[in-house]
Structures are given as C-alpha cells and as structure tokens.
Regions:
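ATP/NTP phosphate-donor binding region
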Residues: 1-17, 27, 257, 268-277, ...
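Short, solvent-exposed S/T- and G/P-enriched segments that are highly enriched in secreted/extracellular
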Residues: 148, 235-240
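Glycine-rich phosphate/pyrophosphate-binding beta-alpha loops
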Residues: 95, 99, 152-165, 233
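Active-site loop ensemble at the mouth of alpha/beta enzyme cores that anchors a bound cofactor
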Residues: 166-173
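Catalytic core of DAGKc-family lipid kinases
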Residues: 35-153
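Catalytic core of tubulin tyrosine ligase-like
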Residues: 246
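Catalytic phosphate-donor-binding core of small-molecule kinases
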Residues: 123-135, 173-176, 180-224, 282-286
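N-terminal glycine-/serine-/threonine-rich phosphate-binding loop
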Residues: 1-43, 65-75
Length: 290
C-alpha cells in the first residue's frame, strides 16, 4: 500500500516523497510518514478523483506538468496534520454525527465519483432524516455541552468543492476549525447549505464556530456516533483529535496561498459545480416541503 511504502521510504531516510494521486493516496502517504521523528518532504501531483487537499495548497489539478513546474519553484510550508485518538492521521477533515452516518447508505460508486460531501449533492433527500443528539465537546477555550446534529474538525478550507466551510482555516496555525451544527430542523439545514456556499454560516445562530488545537467529542446518550476521517470510517465516539503543528513539510503554491485566491482552471470546476448543484437541489427541496 502507499502507506507501507511511505513508511519504508521514511525509515530508510529518503529526503523526498512524491505523491501522484488524489486525497486518499495523500492520506495514506502522510499516515505512513507521520509516526516517524524525521520525515521527508512531500510533493503532490494531483491525479485522483478528488483533490481537495491539492485545491487547498493551490496545486494545479489534472495538469501533471503544471504541478511539476510548481514543485520546481521550491516553495514549501510546514503544514498541520490531524491525529485521531493518538492513532490515525488525517490531512483535511474529520466529521461526525447524523449526516456522517447517513452517508454510509449512499452507494460507494457515488462516493468514488464525487468525493466526501460533494457526492451528497446526489443525496440531498437524506437531510430530513438528520437528528440531533446530546454531546460534550471539550476544546481549548472550554466545554460545549448540548445537542448537535453533526460536527466538523477541519484543517483546510476546501471540502468536496465547498471552499468556504472553514473560510479562515490556515494550513499551519496548529489549530482545527471546529464547526458544531446545533439544529436538525429541515428549513434551518437548507438555509445553512446556502450559507456554506458563501461562507456566511460562521455567524449563524445554529452554528458554533471555534478554533482549537485539541478536541474531544463525547456522546452523552447510548446512541452510537460514527466518525468519518478524510472520507473514510474512523471508528466511533468518544474521540479525541490532536493537531500536530507543522508536522509535514510540503511543496505548495505559496504565491497563490498568500494571495488567497484560486487557480480557476476550467477543467477544475467540477467539484464547485457539484457543490452549487447541491445548494440548488436543497433550495428546490425547501420549496417542495413548504
């Protein structure tokens, strides 16, 4: 596997690992490298179905030569890596709650085609099934205890074509962006989806939007809460997330990150289009249930 090969290369003292693939491949490689004290640099040539991580790093997607040229600029950043229960690692997002659990009923072929969250555009009918549950969430600034329908712990701003779920997320600040969704009301959820496209959800009354270097999520009921880590099943809560600050040195498009805008190649619009379609279908559902 990519994880085993990355671990072997790291142990052998290689200076550089080049990951050619999508988010899943990068996750495996980072997971292979992360347990070691001395780690090689990482370069990415995005060739996968979903390339959210490359999007966050402003690396040209579906253009291997452009990605190689970017690597040649020799711009690197020591990025944060998430760790789950001192075991698994993730590079983009961890999530839990009702929506996460319902997504496991969506056929895997759709997940393969659209990536985590983006493929939910094909499953907007899941929204009426979302339910809240009581949890205790411990973070750097205190404790939240109450009912939530879902939560997200994000390392980057880009998730499945939704580029403003965590609009102020930074790659190297040592902090997760923690988002707690406090409603299961269909109309309020539909409104939130529209807000996510614009990034205006962060101030909504149904959202707790926080920054934290560590997060612990504990269910306060007997109902199981499944965790999703970078789009894959990551066990059940209680769960602790730890931010490994500046853990991997990676080649990035530093000019674009500093300018805070996206490359916008025409071939790279697919996920944005899916995200927009999700919002449109949500609006349509909102009209139908009135």
């Amino acid at each position: 596997s990519a994880q085993k090969e990355a671990a072997r290369a790291t142990e052998a003292g290689f200076d550089l690992i080049v990951a050619a693939g999508g988010d899943g491949t990068i996750n495996e490689i980072v997971s292979g490298m992360s347990p070691f004290d001395k780690r090689p640099k990482l370069a990415i040539i995005p060739t996968g179905t979903t390339n959210d991580f490359a999007r966050a790093l402003k690396i040209p997607r579906n253009k291997p030569l452009a990605a190689v040229e970017m690597i040649g600029k020799n711009q690197t950043l020591n990025i944060d890596v998430g760790q789950v229960n001192d075991a698994e690692y993730f590079i983009n997002i961890a999530a839990g709650g009702s929506l996460t659990e319902l997504t496991y009923s969506v056929p895997s072929r759709l997940k393969t085609a659209f990536g985590y969250l983006a493929y939910l555009a094909k499953g907007v009918d899941l929204l009426p099934q979302i339910r809240k549950r009581k949890v205790k969430v411990t973070h750097d600034d205190g404790v939240f205890e109450g009912e939530i329908s879902m939560f997200f712990a994000a390392l980057t701003n880009s998730v499945g074509g939704f580029e403003k779920i965590a609009p102020d997320a930074k790659l190297d600040d040592g902090l997760f962006t923690l988002i707690l969704v406090k409603t299961d009301n269909l109309f309020e959820l539909l409104a939130l989806i529209s807000m996510v496209i614009k990034g205006s959800h962060v101030d909504d009354v149904n959202i707790e939007y926080l920054k934290s270097s560590q997060i612990k999520v504990e269910p306060l009921t007997d109902k199981k809460m499944m965790i999703n880590v970078d789009g894959e099943y990551g066990g059940d809560a209680p769960v602790t997330f730890r931010n490994l600050h500046g853990h991997i040195e990676i080649f990035v498009n530093l000019d674009e990150i500093n300018n805070d805008h996206y490359l916008g190649d025409e071939e790279e619009e697919d996920l944005e289009a899916v995200a927009q379609k999700f919002a449109e279908e949500a609006e349509q559902l909102k009209e139908e249930v009135k």
